[in-house]
Amino acid sequence: MKFIVKLFPEIMMKSKPVRMRFTKMLETNIRNVLKKVDESAKVQRQWDKIMVMVPDDRPDLVEAFGERLACIPGIAHVLQVNVSTFTSVDDIYQQTLVAYKEQLVGKTFCVRVKRAGKHDFNSIEVERYVGGGLNQFTEAAGVRLKNPDMTVHLEIDNDNLYLIDKRIEGLGGFPMATQEDVLSLISGGFDSGVSSYQFIKRGSRTHYCFFNLGGDQHEIGVKQVAYHLWQKYGESHKVKFISVPFDPVVQEILERIDNGQMGVILKRMMMRAATRVAQKMGIQALVTGEAMGQVSSQTLTNLNVIDRCTEQLILRPLIAMDKQDIINLSRQIGTEDFAKSIPEYCGVISQKPTVKAVLSKVEAEEAKFSEDLLDRVIADAEIIDIREIATQMDTKITETETVDSINANEIIIDVRAPEEEEKSPLKIDGVEVKAIPFYKLATQFADLDKDKSYLLYCDRGVMSKLQALYLQEQGYTNVKVYRP
């Protein structure tokens, strides 16, 4: 059994040196991926295709090889074939009859032949001869050249006959590492996962930069998304995962920045931090999952203001895509379930965000930041090889107890941002409620009465749980999540 790997058409259109470079890289990528499945994998490059050989004594590898080949960038489609030699056109027919006789019962069919090499016949002659024989000596319903029930595909390469057993659609795009590296800003949601995939498919080694706003549980969820994308579509090359602790930035934004400017300024700070990471890694472009008009910070005016904070190239592959199309693609690539479980943070967005930010006003607000703010968060950033995530996933995160009722000796802590808490304060008869924003809780919790139990509350129950997990990691056992 063999696989014939067909190159993506855009590769075929390249000049001879570029096409050769792309094909060599694809051969290497295929070998790197399949060797992880089984060391016996053999890959052979030819001018217009790549051959993958499956050992005769290992039929169990056929399905696994096919699945991996379907996810390697640069492949148009893969043909799963049985290989034999032939002596004449009639010999081709006889072999085809044996292979397809049972499959053709009651079906209309046509025969399609591709041929390479010197022969005393052409492709059409083979199609007519084989098709006529199959029509006469099988129980097929007849020949139909347009829209048949079944197409018999044959390929002839010199004296080799390839009986095509199965066609597997490929990923398309360019082979990994034929384009320059990019740094993708990943949050774990629908958009950033799909935008990362788009650049993997286009041949860029895609590294991941995550801005951590709320603890280990969120980070682990995002790492799972990044690891899935790398393992399924980009495993042929090593990439990095960078985690930047961004809660100090969020804290200063919430304490010092005008409410309407928060969203744009948060994005600008992320771009600045990502630029520093990218420059440190020698990467020239950032990738984001922003789509025009999807949220308030993604108007063209705001995107323009965001881009002014850096000279780094910012690429937005989803800029004109509809949200449903993005979700559909996330389902196709396997990130939808991850995205559904990734939290959206309450209290990190403006109550009345501007849709037409003015650069001068934004810069005036940014002057309120501590001078060393970005230096501090970049210094604390963690850079790991993405392969290390697999072992980190085995780390067990303590489950936080969630309650819907309040007992004696329990105090509720409202961890929402001040604007949200003031807009709809939490009031429960006979129960003490303390308002401590999530970004201050870590530093103020130690000052609270240790003989009391504390129930953390926020609208969505996400930030409260993450803060509870964080406090538990610090050794506090008197904390739960309150979800009425």
Swiss-Prot record:
Residues 63-167 form the THUMP domain. Pathway: Cofactor biosynthesis; thiamine diphosphate biosynthesis. Residues 406-484 form the Rhodanese domain. Its EC number is 2.8.1.4. It catalyses: [ThiI sulfur-carrier protein]-S-sulfanyl-L-cysteine + a uridine in tRNA + 2 reduced [2Fe-2S]-[ferredoxin] + ATP + H(+) = [ThiI sulfur-carrier protein]-L-cysteine + a 4-thiouridine in tRNA + 2 oxidized [2Fe-2S]-[ferredoxin] + AMP + diphosphate; [ThiS sulfur-carrier protein]-C-terminal Gly-Gly-AMP + S-sulfanyl-L-cysteinyl-[cysteine desulfurase] + AH2 = [ThiS sulfur-carrier protein]-C-terminal-Gly-aminoethanethioate + L-cysteinyl-[cysteine desulfurase] + A + AMP + 2 H(+). It is an enzyme of class 2 (transferase). It is found in: Cytoplasm. Disulfide bonds join 346-458. Keywords: ATP-binding, Cytoplasm, Disulfide bond, Nucleotide-binding, Redox-active center, RNA-binding, Thiamine biosynthesis, Transferase, tRNA-binding. GO terms for molecular function: ATP binding; CCA tRNA nucleotidyltransferase activity; tRNA binding; tRNA-uracil-4 sulfurtransferase activity. The active site is at residue 458. InterPro entries: Rhodanese-like_dom, Rhodanese-like_dom_sf, Rossmann-like_a/b/a_fold, ThiI_AANH, ThiI_fer, ThiI_N, THII_Thiazole_biosynth_dom, THUMP_dom. Catalyzes the ATP-dependent transfer of a sulfur to tRNA to produce 4-thiouridine in position 8 of tRNAs, which functions as a near-UV photosensor. Also catalyzes the transfer of sulfur to the sulfur carrier protein ThiS, forming ThiS-thiocarboxylate. This is a step in the synthesis of thiazole, in the thiamine biosynthesis pathway. The sulfur is donated as persulfide by IscS. HAMAP family: ThiI (MF_00021). This is tRNA sulfurtransferase. It comes from Shewanella halifaxensis (strain HAW-EB4). The lineage of its organism: Bacteria, Pseudomonadati, Pseudomonadota, Gammaproteobacteria, Alteromonadales. The gene is thiI.
